[in-house]
Regions:
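Post-signal-peptide mature chains of secreted/extracellular proteins
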Residues: 1-131
Length: 131
């Protein structure tokens, strides 16, 4: 999905609305997303919220993925410290996306780290499952 400037986002409305993670999960399953793809979607959506505020990522796949987005500006900010500037909807979405991601990672037996995914994984999710 795109904003009014044509910028692509995997969870476009996460800034303005508390998104229903169960509805997103159902939608992803309806599009035949695998459990790993669903975990990847929630991982990407979490990091997308931080990226909007100029988070500096240390995971190479996130560095490359967000570096390819025209809207992203690396301001050198620690993703863990910028939470204070999130909108209330973003704070809720960040937490809710994290819980859902953790459920899937536990089910899959993988860590919840973005290091589980490549740039190609994130790009595939963005191109096929933008909500």
């Amino acid at each position: 999905n795109y904003d009014s400037y044509g910028n692509e986002f995997v969870a476009y409305d996460s800034r303005n609305y508390v998104m229903d993670v169960d509805a997103i999960e159902t939608w992803l399953k309806g599009k035949s997303a695998t459990d790993r793809e669903i975990a990847c979607w929630f991982t990407l959506a979490i990091n997308e919220i931080s990226a909007r505020y100029g988070a500096q990522f240390s995971t190479n796949s996130l560095v490359v993925y967000f570096g390819s987005k025209s809207w992203y500006q690396n301001l050198g900010d620690d993703p863990n410290k910028i939470r204070s500037v999130f909108t209330s909807a973003e704070k809720s979405n960040f937490d809710n996306f994290g819980r859902k991601r953790n459920q899937y990672c536990k089910k899959l037996g993988i860590s919840s780290s973005a290091k589980e995914y490549s740039y190609e994984d994130f790009n595939y999710i963005a191109n096929n499952f933008a909500y």
